[in-house]
């Protein structure tokens, strides 16, 4: 799963990537909901569902959220992506979340990984596309 997350981070941070490119990469049953595209049964091993959210332009992805079949241990994420920054839960009473700033050298954008930690690890991860500030 770590290798898949790294690959998707490079994809989402690529200059010129579109929502359609990312949906094609996920290769599942896609349903366009206007603001986002739900992808059921993506071809990514270990992923049950994905949601690709559009940025304000409607063309590029803002982020992609993956619902995982098996949790990824927090220790594996930290060993692979470095020390995370805790961020507030998505909603009151929601799972703890950890933000990993990823070192993606791929043009004008970079990526961050936000892991929702419950029990044995992260069952939901979000890869966010961020403009490179430095």
Can you say where each PLM-predicted feature lies in the sequence?
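Short, exposed beta-strand-loop hairpins at the edges of beta-sheets
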Residues: 103-106, 110-121
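Short helix/turn-capping signatures at newly exposed starts of structured segments
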Residues: 1-92, 96-98, 121, 127-134
């Amino acid at each position: 799963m770590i290798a898949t997350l790294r690959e998707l981070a490079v994809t989402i941070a690529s200059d010129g990537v579109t929502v359609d490119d990312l949906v094609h990469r996920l290769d599942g049953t896609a349903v366009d909901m206007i603001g986002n595209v739900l992808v059921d049964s993506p071809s990514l091993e270990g992923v049950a569902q994905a949601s690709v959210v559009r940025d304000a332009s409607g063309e590029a992805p803002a982020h992609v959220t993956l619902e995982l079949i098996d949790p990824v241990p927090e220790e594996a994420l930290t060993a692979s992506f470095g020390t995370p920054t805790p961020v507030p839960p998505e909603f009151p009473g929601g799972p703890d979340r950890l933000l990993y700033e990823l070192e993606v050298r791929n043009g004008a954008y970079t990526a961050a990984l936000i892991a929702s930690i419950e029990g044995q690890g992260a069952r939901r991860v979000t890869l966010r596309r961020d403009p490179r500030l430095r």
